């Protein structure tokens, strides 16, 4: 850890895939097995919980994964960062204010995404969809369980989120720079906020227009992103037995999701 123990870096074992023959064969989240990705996710959950237990000044623990240098990675090796900070950021405070005004805001958004045809995949504990309103093309995974804090969830609930995140990484591949960001309810926040993971594809360059207008141009819209990812997952499921975790439903098979946060 760095900075007095409030910055942990989790480093994966492999740098190259076992079958790599050139420098394009980097080992990333997409090349992990289902079981390995579950362990990788639980390791990060344990690390974030440990920071809250070990440092009373930590108000929020940020968990993120920068994949490849264009996405901010210091080195092209699979790693997660777990960083404890002593205050809630402005963005999180604004989100909490919106939640205080409407406790159903996350359900409302997921319901809207379903009606808009943006659901990518689902299982019995989570739902994945094409995100809206991000600076980059993005995919989101929401836990549909009743518990908000990842470290308080049953292992199978964490696995449900992990399995969909893993599937989205596989659909993305290892050649696309991306940021994986975790969002959840911080300790001390009264209103329920479900755990969600956002994958942002860093495939566009922000320039003067975006800075001047705060209008962010993207090369792929949410519906096209959804169609592309569903197609990749369907092909993967058909061609590689066991590549996706059991119980994952794709595209129109998913049905309408329901977030149970606040129902514990």
Model-identified regions with their sequence ranges:
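HIT superfamily nucleotide-processing domains
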Residues: 1-264
């Amino acid at each position: 850890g760095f900075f007095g123990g409030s910055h942990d870096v989790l480093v994966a074992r492999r740098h190259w895939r076992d079958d790599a023959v050139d420098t394009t064969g980097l080992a990333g989240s997409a090349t992990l097995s289902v079981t390995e990705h579950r362990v990788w996710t639980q390791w990060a959950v344990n690390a974030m919980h440990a920071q809250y237990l070990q440092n009373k000044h930590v108000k929020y623990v940020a968990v993120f994964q920068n994949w490849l240098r264009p996405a901010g990675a210091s080195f092209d090796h699979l790693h997660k960062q777990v960083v404890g900070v002593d205050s809630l950021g402005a963005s999180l405070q604004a989100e909490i204010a919106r939640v205080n005004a409407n406790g159903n805001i996350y359900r409302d958004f997921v319901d809207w995404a379903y009606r808009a045809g943006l659901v990518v995949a689902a299982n019995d504990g989570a739902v994945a969809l094409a995100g809206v309103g991000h600076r980059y093309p993005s995919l989101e995974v929401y836990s549909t369980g009743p518990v908000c804090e990842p470290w308080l969830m049953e292992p199978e609930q964490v696995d449900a989120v992990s399995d969909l995140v893993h599937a989205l990484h596989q659909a993305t591949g290892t050649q696309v720079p991306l940021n994986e960001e975790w969002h959840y309810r911080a300790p001390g926040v009264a209103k329920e906020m479900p755990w969600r993971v956002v994958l942002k594809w860093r495939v566009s360059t922000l320039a003067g227009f975006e800075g001047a207008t705060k209008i962010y141009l993207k090369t792929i819209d949410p519906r096209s992103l959804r169609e592309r990812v569903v197609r990749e997952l369907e092909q993967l499921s058909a061609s590689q037995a066991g590549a996706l975790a059991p119980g994952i439903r794709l595209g129109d098979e998913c049905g309408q999701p329901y977030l149970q946060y606040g129902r514990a």
